[in-house]
């Protein structure tokens, strides 16, 4: 419901909540799994490795724990700060980490907008608020033992 509400207040082309999952593959690479979405569908699974950090903004955000705001995707592509033709599906992207209180990344909120400069200050506030609000439920979903420890403190 919170994703629906934020999407109504700050509409965009795509809004996706990814959960950070432990590695379940032979090369021990953790990945992001799409848990919820509004608007156009984005990738179901994104690996967290060096190659994907350049091609998928949510992977970069999950690896660094930093918010990434790209108001002009073609410009970032021309600078090689972002790579891959799939990024041309939008002109603006914002990728926000969803973190525990200690800064550990639980997931990523990925947003895409059809036009350049798609995320004004009001939209950034709405989406940042959602990223903060998602921390507790995402921790309970993905790390239930740590959520119980936090409640006991």
Question: Locations of the language-model features?
Answer:
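A short, aliphatic-rich beta-strand micro-motif
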Residues: 92-100
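Juxtadomain coupling helices with adjacent low-complexity linkers
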Residues: 107-153
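Regulatory sensory and allosteric helical modules in signal-transduction proteins
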Residues: 19-83
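Residue-level marker of regulatory loop/turn positions in helix-turn-helix DNA-binding domains and
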Residues: 50, 87, 119
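Intrinsically disordered, low-complexity terminal regulatory regions
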Residues: 1-40, 140-153
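Short loop/turn motifs at secondary-structure junctions and domain boundaries
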Residues: 84-91
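Broad gene-expression machinery/nucleic-acid interaction feature
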Residues: 14, 93, 108
